[in-house]
A protein has these predicted regions:
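Alpha-helical scaffold/interaction cores of sigma-54-like transcription cofactors
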Residues: 1-535
């Protein structure tokens, strides 16, 4: 999908819409070494009554040779193994060997993508011995092993007459594996452009071999595999075997380790903290009113299961203050909590200012509390490192975010690939600016602006190169261009991170999740915002 950065023009939402239109019942996501789009894909499939199959394309090493493998999760154990494998790939710069694969086979189906495999290279060099040895090793460790044949192979008479016959003699199972890197045949230009952008603006040689990597309709695929219908039947067989169930909406909160019952400890800290606060009040107050409010808030927090959440925030705020790291007085709805005020998390008395606790936390609205804490931007990392050390490297991570193609970036990159001169590029921007001078459109797509500008349409009609640049820029807008780190978000988990999300390298020796903040929150994980301010 689009989440194989600059390797695919296949956007998840339009892909699922197309699958639904074609009345297809299942689809497998197989990105290159990463699982960035897994949750979005899974949710979008379920929303449209299409069965999601979770997969991963793995590059592994064996005897100084590199081979590719497609792995699909049969069950949740397999899904866990995919997350481990993807994490290993990203954290070791794609350094996975055969021995590691042997340890992580449970719950997985393996498919050798013939056209991208070392087996094809061996056979084309008439080295059947090494080809079969490679296949036998894989067959030995994966109880469900297939050779996947794409359109290029199945329509190649030389392959069918020679190599296919040889492979069939060894009783391997075969499956149709038409690779999809872009949705419509007309999206080939967007795909080649993305690959060129990855290749420093230079079109990739031999990419014409990928022309068939679009989503073929059912009739076309049935025609292509007409003489090998068993391969199509195996796609259904595999889809039926794969039944990963990802749970959403259930909180997976970490525990604050104090050696005491969390709620009892929270209650004790709040009582001590509130007494200290009241001793410093310079205004009259009703003590009973404060304790009634405190007990009410504590009961709500306890009923909703958030005692540990408040203790975790209290702990790192206390660390910051103890180490002379300035902490903001509170922002958003958090200052409406007397518990937060009593713990020293915020500095605003919610009763004095008549702030409603329900704006912050409400039993009728099932959502995680959201306490954003401000730190000086030059000391924020100290607090994050403290949290990482306290809860362990395997339980604390930065959060992934994508840098996507915005209008200007898409046009600039396409102009570079197709060598559009500066004069024409400036002309495009002049008309783009003119069409939205009065901000009539809120965050418009490039396509919307072109449709609203007769001048841009005229340019496209008169100049083929401008037409090409703008047409492709429309197609790649909003596709991820690079990965980045969420400006403030940190996730803390109850158990090892890899039980919930695959991992990437992060900053300051702290891992980074492969899932975005929205995905992590859907999984019920605890996201906390450590905001860095200059002033």
């Amino acid at each position: 999908t689009e989440n194989s950065i600059l390797q695919s023009a296949c956007k998840i939402k339009p892909l699922i819409e197309k699958l639904k239109e074609q009345q297809l019942h299942s689809c497998a996501i197989v990105d290159e070494g990463t699982m960035y789009g897994t949750i979005k894909f899974y949710q979008e499939c379920n929303k449209n009554n299409i069965k999601p199959v979770i997969g991963l394309k793995v590059k592994y090493h064996y005897n100084d040779k590199t081979n590719n493998l497609v792995l699909l999760a049969i069950n949740n154990f397999g899904y866990q193994n995919l997350m481990k494998i993807s994490s290993r790939l990203q954290l070791t710069n794609n350094n996975i060997d055969f021995e590691y694969l042997q340890k992580t086979t449970m719950g997985l189906i393996a498919i050798l993508p013939y056209e991208e495999s070392i087996v094809q290279k061996y056979l084309e060099r008439n080295d059947a011995k090494n080809a079969i040895q490679t296949l036998e090793l894989l067959k030995e460790i994966y109880s469900d092993f297939y050779i996947g044949l794409g359109i290029k192979s199945i329509t190649n008479s030389n392959f069918i007459d020679n190599y296919f016959k040889l492979l069939k003699n060894y009783n391997y199972q075969f499956v149709a594996l038409p690779k999809v890197s872009f949705i419509n045949e007309s999206d080939y230009d967007a795909y080649t452009t993305l690959k060129a952008i990855k290749n420093n603006g230079v079109l990739v040689e031999g990419i014409e071999n990928d022309k068939n990597n679009y989503l073929h309709d059912v009739k076309s695929v049935e025609t292509i595999y007409y003489n090998h219908y068993d391969m199509l039947e195996n796609t259904t067989k595999i889809a039926n075997m794969c039944n990963v169930q990802i749970e959403f909406g259930k909180y997976q909160l970490p525990l604050y380790e104090s050696g005491l019952d969390s709620f009892a400890y929270l209650k004790e800290l709040c009582s001590i903290g509130l007494e200290k606060r009241m001793q410093n009040f310079e205004y009259s107050y009703d003590k009973r009113k404060y304790y009634d409010r405190l007990n009410y808030e504590l009961n709500v927090i306890n009923e909703m299961g958030f005692s540990d959440y408040f203790l975790i925030v209290y702990d790192y705020v206390k660390y910051a203050k103890k180490n002379n790291i300035f902490v903001g007085p509170g922002r958003g709805s958090a200052p409406a909590s007397l518990v937060a005020y009593s713990l020293g998390i915020t500095e605003i008395d919610p009763l004095y200012y008549n702030l409603l606790f329900e704006r912050f936390l409400n039993k009728e609205r099932l959502s995680m509390p959201d306490i954003d804490i401000d730190f000086p931007d030059d000391r924020r990392d100290e607090v994050i490192r403290y949290v990482g050390k306290k809860y362990g490297k395997n339980r604390v991570a930065h959060i992934l975010t994508f840098g996507t193609f915005k209008i200007r970036q898409a046009i600039n990159d396409c102009a570079r690939v197709f060598k559009l001169n500066d004069v024409k590029t400036k002309e495009i921007y002049k008309h783009l600016q003119a069409v939205n001078t009065y901000k009539v459109y809120d965050n418009p797509s490039l396509k919307t602006l072109i449709e609203a500008s007769s001048d841009l349409q005229l340019l496209m009609n008169n100049y083929e190169d401008i037409n090409k640049v703008l047409t492709i820029a429309c197609k790649i807008q909003d596709i991820p261009r690079n990965i980045s780190t969420h400006a403030a978000g940190i996730v803390i988990t109850k158990f090892d991170l890899v039980n919930y999300t695959p991992l990437d390298e992060g900053l300051d020796e702290i891992y980074q999740t492969q899932y975005e903040a929205k995905d992590l929150e859907a999984l019920g994980l605890l996201k906390m915002d450590f905001l860095g301010l200059k002033n």
